[in-house]
Amino acid sequence: MELFPARADIVMPAGVAGPDPVSFVVHAFVVRDGDDIILVDTLQQPGHVDLIAEALARAGSGFEAIRYIVLTHHHPDHTGGLAEVVSRAPQAQVLGGAGDARVIAEATRVAVDVVGAGDSVLGLEVVPTPGHTAGHVCLVDPGSSTVLLGDVVGNIGRLERGPAQFTENADQAEATLHALADRGLEHGVPSHGDPFAGASRSIAELLRTSA
């Protein structure tokens, strides 16, 4: 698996996450498997399609090579660019978790097929990771022991849980962290922040040291 991130800088308006505007970074990921591409998430705005195009170019590819678009969850910073991406990659099959696929489809007017436990996408294992949203999914590459984490955790200076104010079910989110801590994964790639080594060990340490 070869991974090429697309980074977008977002400003959340005052009143959404508190009284003041909030700035943050979110990533989508171009995953190359030979000549085929999986796009994981689509950033927030239609204009962010150019950032995805740049990541595709770094992968030596283009929109015509996208076979699958996998959406980790329904939040708009991950799905807002979907319709524009699909307009450039109409051949791509769009996939999301069972708890989120309908929400995404209604918000974007794009058909979303459901994936879940036991499914794989070009060799990447689909892992349901509910909590942040009901249908949140991660992708695991068994060959490199890498997990694409979506918003299960962030790593901006330090490893942290997904923001509480945007987490739909805190108990499920904790159970998801425990499940990932037990998997022995080596490399973690969150949507917010930097990749980190010792993915499962680091998540276990997060659980041990913070409530």
Feature annotation, model-predicted:
Residues 1-36, 47, 178-184, 198-201:
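Zn-dependent metallo-beta-lactamase
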Residues 1-3, 32-37, 119-125, 142-145:
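Beta-strand-turn-beta hairpins that frame and shape the catalytic cleft
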Residues 30-32, 66, 140:
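Short, well-ordered beta-strand micro-motif
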Residues 4, 70, 95, 113, ...:
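Hydrophobic/aromatic beta-strand patches that form the interior of the parallel beta-sheet core
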Residues 37, 44-46, 128, 134-210:
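Metallo-beta-lactamase
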Residues 80, 124, 167-168:
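Residue-level signal for the nucleotide or nucleotide-sugar donor/cofactor binding architecture
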